[in-house]
């Protein structure tokens, strides 16, 4: 149950600051945003900068610098803290470093008395979401990761550009790891209400083009990192979307890091991985278990096994 429409952000780096900015300019629900960072001056500077723009907002939001004690009455704690992916690194390369950072963060948040919902955006996000669940001992529906929400947004952008159709009218998901082993649910994809299979049969797109689009989705982060050093605007918007879904009790379907324990064929168990789920004020209302093709199911299992191999190395 929501208490105060209060959000605490832990991590004032590029992703956290982009989320905070997105939340302030498109805010109709959150009353208070508290920013915490190990670099206190950075957090204080972000708070000042955001507050100095209050005159230009349709609805003001109380932005404050804080400490872990401020988590006690928060509805949501968003975590973007941790080491960033560097050029040439995969997200999975960050497991050991960020899992240690998370142990300290989660311990401090839980010690405050926080009993709301965690939203995790730090990479590798599926594993960090699992780590959060284990360290916090929170119910699985109250621990959410950004999952493949950004991958899905990238996919819909590329399809929108290819077909000249608004992204809102493209229904397709990226599932699996937020990373190199992800896959697209092509068999379930619809563009402007029309199944993708019809576009293929009509010769309006080819399987080869679809493969190239997926490669662009997978490589997008590497390209952005190479060009500007980090990705943060798009994922900041994605986090804002998840937070609004919770605060606004939207019951919206989002491709988040969902807890899978036997869905999708029964082979994937005890893992957080990108899959569509219904998000509401309680967190995850339901992880969807829709039918995917045998080929897609094999990719899903492979992606889960890859994540599992890294999780098994973490000492809880």
UniProtKB/Swiss-Prot annotation:
Q: What residues bind beta-D-fructose 1,6-bisphosphate, as annotated?
A: 156, 171
Which pathway does the protein contribute to?
Answer: Fermentation; pyruvate fermentation to lactate; (S)-lactate from pyruvate: step 1/1
Q: A Gene Ontology MF term for this entry? A: L-lactate dehydrogenase activity
Q: CDD domains given for it?
A: HicDH_like
SUPFAM superfamilies in alphabetical order: LDH C-terminal domain-like, NAD(P)-binding Rossmann-fold domains
What top-level branch of life does the organism fall under?
Bacteria
Notes on how activity is controlled: Allosterically activated by fructose 1,6-bisphosphate (FBP).
Q: Name one GO cellular component term.
A: cytoplasm
Q: Which residues take part in binding substrate?
A: 85, 91, 123-126, 151-154, 231
Role of this protein? Catalyzes the conversion of lactate to pyruvate.
What is this protein identified as?
A: L-lactate dehydrogenase
């Amino acid at each position: 149950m929501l208490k105060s429409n209060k959000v605490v952000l832990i991590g004032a780096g590029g992703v956290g600051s982009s989320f905070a900015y997105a939340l302030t300019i498109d805010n109709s629900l959150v009353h208070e945003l508290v920013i915490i960072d190990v670099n206190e001056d950075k957090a204080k500077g972000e708070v000042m900068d955001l507050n100095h723009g209050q005159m230009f907002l349709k609805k003001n939001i109380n932005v404050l610098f804080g400490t872990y004690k401020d988590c006690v009455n928060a509805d949501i704690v968003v975590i973007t803290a941790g080491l960033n992916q560097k050029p040439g690194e995969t997200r999975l390369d960050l497991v050991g470093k960020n899992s240690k950072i998370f142990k300290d963060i989660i311990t401090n948040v839980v010690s405050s008395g926080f009993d709301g919902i965690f939203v995790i955006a730090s990479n590798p996000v599926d594993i960090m979401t699992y780590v959060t669940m284990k360290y916090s001992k929170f119910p699985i529906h109250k621990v959410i990761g950004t999952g493949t929400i950004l991958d899905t947004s990238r996919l819909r952008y590329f399809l929108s550009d290819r077909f000249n159709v608004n992204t809102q009218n493209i229904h397709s998901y990226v599932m699996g790891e937020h990373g190199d082993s992800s896959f697209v649910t092509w068999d379930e994809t619809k563009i402007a209400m029309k199944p993708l299979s019809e576009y293929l049969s009509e010769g309006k797109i080819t399987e080869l083009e679809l493969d190239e689009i997926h490669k662009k989705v997978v490589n997008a982060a590497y390209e952005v990192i190479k060009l500007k050093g980090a990705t943060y605007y798009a994922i900041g918007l994605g986090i804002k979307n998840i937070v609004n879904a919770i605060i606004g009790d939207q019951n919206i379907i989002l491709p988040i890091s969902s807890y899978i324990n036997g869905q999708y064929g029964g082979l994937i168990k005890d893992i957080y991985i990108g899959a569509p789920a219904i998000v509401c004020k309680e967190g995850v209302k339901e992880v969807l278990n829709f039918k995917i093709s045998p080929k897609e199911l094999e990719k899903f299992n492979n992606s889960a096994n890859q994540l599992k191999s890294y999780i098994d190395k973490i000492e809880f």
